[in-house]
Amino acid sequence: MIRISEIQLQLDGTEEDLKKQAASRLKIAPEKIRSLTLVKKSVDARKKDNVHFICTVDVDCPLERFPKDSKITQAEAYHYALPQGKPRALRPVVVGFGPAGLFAALILAQAGQRPVVFERGSAVENRQKQVAHFWKTGALNPACNVQFGEGGAGTFSDGKLNTGTKDSRARKVLEEFVGAGAPAEILYMAKPHIGTDRLPGAVKAIREQILSLGGEVHFDTAVQNILIKDENVTGVEVKPQDAAPYTVATDRLILAVGHSARDTFEMLYSLGIPMEQKPFSVGARIEHPQCMIDRAQYGKFAGHPNLGAADYKLAVHLENGRGVYTFCMCPGGSVVAAASEPGRLVTNGMSNFARNGENANAAILVGVEPQDFGDEHPLAGMYFQRRLESEAFRVGGENYFAPVQRVEDFLKRVPTKLLGDVKPTYLPGVTPCNLDDCLPDFVADSMRQGILLMNRKLNGFSYGDALLTAVETRSSSPVRVLRGENLQSLLAKGLFPCGEGAGYAGGIISAAVDGIKCAEQVILAP
């Protein structure tokens, strides 16, 4: 196969147009191309009067002479090589069933290791009902919510699959998702997403594959303790929601609990498991009319059916040394209640596959360093998050209504009394207020500077009626659970801290890749 990159395709261009351009680049007749596969497709909107796609394709054709063109290369077929290991006397245990745990369990199952999975939250079918109930009534289930349950926090985020990782295992993740029913376009879109409406079905299909290969998945079952003897993992104590605790023996434990498993972090600390503070970011969600973002990004081409809703990714560096950036941008989406602890309020963003909602939203975040925590305790960052979430809960009215403020009012430091053109999407409801009442001064001041600077990059970003919804604290884990080159804990042999919660990933793909890497080490370990 021959790979051709940087082919320009007009917005109304067809596969036949792509084929003709590929043939032209190869200096052959189009009919000589036996097959053409789209490998990557992205939008080039740098010139607003010429918005188009940039494509990479693989073609199969006879070629007498290879063109001297750096954009034409031999395509290397990807094939994931499953590690070969021996069956063990004790089955490996996976704790957590988000992206890291899901793919760790899948690889273990495909390798014949018959993993046993424990997830504190519910299966995705019941989880969706629990989350919908919380959004409607404000009645939180601390064990099953936007953070906990099958699929992890990413299930209610848009299913964004874009990643900075260059690890080839990312292709394995995408192929497994497509095999589980996700849209095939995630294999080639530059910014792939499955959508909150479609991701649950794909997650369920992967779970069913794990079960068919001899694995077990226990939902509504929390791990209360890790048993360690002579610096070796010997088992876990688990507590089903409606049954007595029991112990499971294992000498291989993948801990993939996500960034919000705060009781697990406290348990690890009590066991003396080495961990350290980690930088993260906090801020709020910002909502604009999606049509405004479309016009700012695509100009006269805004609304073109082949473009869909526009996104953005912005970052600025302030004179005070802080970084401010947008994160987890959700075109045509909603701001959602993402709390997992009573008395604490958290926001997140999500959108369905069609991305056809009226508003665009993204987190606008300020970098937070360990010196901001006010304590050297390894969990000080987690306690910092809790303080912000408690303040947001208080300011919102102590009923999971979120504090909101118009951008114009936020910039002027005056409370919002009435909302403007942008209608909030957050449920169960919102409370107009002054966000300075629930954000640290350095965060609020940095956000104000950031919004004005970002408006220079994206026209309309500082729109007065744009809406800020607080507080966003779960952009990444506040701790890193230390591990060695074999991916095992520095203290406990057989304990594999994994994924975003352990501080080694950020997002669905990188977490899933880390889950695969940990599973490989479990399989190959002596």
Model-derived features: positions:
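Residues forming the flavin
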Residues: 1-51, 58-156, 160-526
